[in-house]
């Protein structure tokens, strides 16, 4: 028991040396927020303390401060805590400040009405696709688990594969090597071998669209296309999610046409003009 406490203290001291002076409580509070974001139904104080590498009294004091500001509340389970919906309001304000949302939203809403399906819009951040806008289906019954602000892996999502396909040629191999421990089969359809992914990305570049064929979740399919900026880069992607059974009924071609038109409209507003080497979305 004594060794565990000493080890925890040494870990805390090592981390604190790397932080700017006077910011210890801020860093610790933000760390608790990030941990709690993975426990929507609440996390017990003891487990939260263990995950944070802090003693219970310190965690409890920080939680009290977050509670007083309205960001944390007690969960139904005794001794557990969870985040409040105040984060939704804060996140929405941050997202609304992004010009891309104002540019893309009208086009995405029109696509949502035209298809009746779930519409997703993401940006690229390092080795993830981040969902920054989402519209629920108007006619389809499927409600996906994806949420605004979610970091999605590149290898098993349609929009993620778009970023890999239209990114730097050397990036994919580097990504594969550095994320080998994360690249695991989520379903029997998940691509986990690099040669197979190279083939997949070549097809995506040729067709201008990416598919998630139940690679992330059984029963759910997704079609994505790139959004180009004025420099011909792909900072964003738009996709349609729906049940695999409904996709078979509607047909890929019937969804690809309005999806491509939407991506083209957003790309045009970002200053992109179609070139022979980047004409895939037309």
UniProtKB/Swiss-Prot annotation:
MF annotations from Gene Ontology: DNA binding; DNA-binding transcription factor activity
Keyword DNA-binding listed: yes
Keyword annotations from UniProtKB, A to Z: DNA-binding, Repressor, Transcription, Transcription regulation
Superkingdom of origin organism: Bacteria
HTH iclR-type domain segment(s): 23-85
Keyword check for Transport: no
Biased composition (Basic and acidic residues): 1-20
Positions of the DNA-binding region: 45-64
Induction field: Expression of yiaJ is autogenously regulated and reduced by the binding of CRP-cAMP to the CRP site 1 of the YiaK-S promoter.
Residues in the signal sequence: none
Region described as Disordered: 1-21
Gene Ontology BP term (one): negative regulation of DNA-templated transcription
Residue ranges of domain IclR-ED in the record: 100-272
Function comment: Negatively controls the transcription of the yiaKLMNOPQRS operon, which may be involved in the utilization of 2,3-diketo-L-gulonate.
The protein's name in its UniProt record: DNA-binding transcriptional repressor YiaJ
């Amino acid at each position: 028991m004594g060794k565990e406490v000493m080890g925890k203290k040494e870990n805390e001291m090592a981390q604190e040396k790397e932080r700017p002076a006077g910011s210890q409580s801020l860093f610790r509070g933000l760390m608790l927020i990030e941990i709690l974001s993975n426990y929507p139904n609440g996390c017990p104080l003891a487990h939260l303390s263990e995950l944070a590498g802090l003693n219970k009294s310190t965690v409890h004091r920080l939680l009290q401060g977050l509670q007083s500001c309205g960001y944390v509340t007690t969960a139904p389970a005794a001794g557990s805590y969870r985040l409040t919906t105040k984060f939704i309001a804060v996140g929405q304000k941050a997202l609304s400040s992004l010009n891309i949302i104002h540019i893309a939203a009208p086009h995405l809403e029109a696509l949502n009405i035209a298809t009746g399906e779930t519409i997703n819009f993401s940006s690229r951040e390092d080795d993830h696709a981040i969902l920054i806008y989402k519209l629920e289906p108007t006619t389809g019954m499927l409600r996906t688990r994806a949420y605004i602000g979610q970091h999605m892996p590149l290898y098993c999502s349609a929009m993620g594969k778009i970023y890999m396909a239209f990114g730097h040629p050397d990036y994919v191999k580097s990504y594969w090597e550095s994320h080998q421990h994360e690249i695991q089969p989520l379903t029997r359809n998940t691509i986990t071998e690099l040669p197979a992914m190279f083939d997949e990305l070549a097809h995506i570049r040729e067709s201008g669209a990416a598919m998630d064929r139940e690679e992330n979740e059984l029963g759910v399919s997704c079609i994505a296309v790139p959004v180009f900026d004025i420099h011909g880069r792909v900072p964003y992607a738009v996709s349609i999610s729906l049940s695999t059974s409904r996709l078979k009924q509607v047909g890929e071609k019937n969804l690809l046409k309005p999806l491509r038109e939407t991506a083209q409209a957003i790309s045009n507003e970002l200053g992109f003009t179609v070139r022979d080497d980047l004409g895939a979305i037309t």
